[in-house]
Amino acid sequence: MESQTTFKYESLAFTKLSHCQWTDYFLSVPIDESELDVITREIDILKPEVMELLSSQGDDETSKRKVLLIQLLLSLGLAFHFENEIKNILEHAFRKIDDITGDEKDLSTISIMFRVFRTYGHNLPSSVFKRFTGDDGKFQQSLTEDAKGILSLYEAAHLGTTTDYILDEALKFTSSHLKSLLAGGTCRPHILRLIRNTLYLPQRWNMEAVIAREYISFYEQEEDHDKMLLRLAKLNFKLLQLHYIKELKSFIKWWMELGLTSKWPSQFRERIVEAWLAGLMMYFEPQFSGGRVIAAKFNYLLTILDDACDHYFSIHELTRLVACVERWSPDGIDTLEDISRSVFKLMLDVFDDIGKGVRSEGSSYHLKEMLEELNTLVRANLDLVKWARGIQVPSFEEHVEVGGIALTSYATLMYSFVGMGETAGKEAYEWVRSRPRLIKSLAAKGRLMDDITDFDSDMSNGFAANAINYYMKQFVVTKEEAILECQRMIVDINKTINEELLKTTSVPGRVLKQALNFGRLLELLYTKSDDIYNCSEGKLKEYIVTLLIDPIRL
């Protein structure tokens, strides 16, 4: 049994983490407000030209061209400018979908149409791909001569549900041939680069800002690119970069004014730019600029709380913190010690800071719902700490459920609603609190991905609370068998997520997109079993440089 004295974090063998390397750099980057104005004016001049393309009247071929244009707008990061037009086009086109797709024999066209309709909530049947299979149900080998078609089908396969068996076959077929294309090097360099990026992470699960940056580079190398669209995409991304740097400056200054850095042990993560980047993963559009700063503040708080639970808190101290959060009074600080006092003070400061904004908007329910979720989160962390220290041993299923809460799955999604105004009203918070199948699936996915990534380090640190560990013990299997089974679960969970995104009608589409974006966040953090949030080099550094430092040439 753990002693009721304060647990000493020095006794744990956790690796010391480096401090944020980016803060000084971004504070020094100048922002020219006049440049923002010039870019905005040119964007406003070009947008009507796209509107004209989207509003053109015609036959089924015209409808088909519009759907293909919508996918191009999505890939270039421009679709948010035309959401109403896109919604109307797809609703009209879906009513005559059989006429539009009936005689189409082009693999890329069908794959793109499938992706677009499903992305916007229209359940286009996967049977549209049967025209590309033989009597044995296998995809025709002649398709392998169409590199872009294979790539489009690979992308489409990631929108499959639990009953889209043909897409399972499509994924095997396309993965094999795309890897062969990479190895053979017969495609043009920009196509090979797109294939490599897509195999790392398909658009379905990638960050929208990353998709846009990569696809702009690809599209510029296409001989038949539309110069107007390319110019608009570049201007749009340049404007986003300027917005992002302004947000980072604001967030970094807020963090510096807190003056808490000297109070944290060296094991705690000063992930400042990373906390903002996690907010960018939830929404990239300029109208959510304030929301990203809010999300960054919450992400910083949640990172510190996670570190305190992993590295410092005794069960006794965390129990006292749980009681303070439930009472939610500054008076409770006096009952806490050292780090827990600073953590609770940070909680109060963040909620007070965010509260000033939402109260002025007449949306005080935001705070009530978020505080309730914070209560749930710290209680889940208490359970996890008890399990980690061997005080209690949960089942594999219980760990995945409670661990999904402790991973901040529900809190991260709910906190992203704050910067969305009336788009995410009270019903959005109530929906998350009801624990719908979609969000429970996302939470389980996050827990499994995190525990697969951290298994070796958790075990070497004596940290028992890990899904792989519990699966091995409960089902008497090896580490390798447990990991393979959990990876299979993640594949099935992704299909369930896709299914629930199509079936859920109780909340607005933008709220559903936040759920999808949380799934994307998980993929970005844990793809290839590489916890990039805790590694300042590698892929995370690449994202920061690509999105914020490398200028896009206009």
UniProtKB/Swiss-Prot annotation:
GO terms for molecular function: (Z)-gamma-bisabolene synthase activity; cyclase activity; magnesium ion binding; terpene synthase activity. One of its GO terms (biological process) is farnesyl diphosphate metabolic process. Induction: By wounding. It holds the Pfam family Terpene_synth. A motif (DDXXD motif) lies at residues 306-310. Its EC number is 4.2.3.40. This is (Z)-gamma-bisabolene synthase 1. It comes from Arabidopsis thaliana. The gene is TPS12.
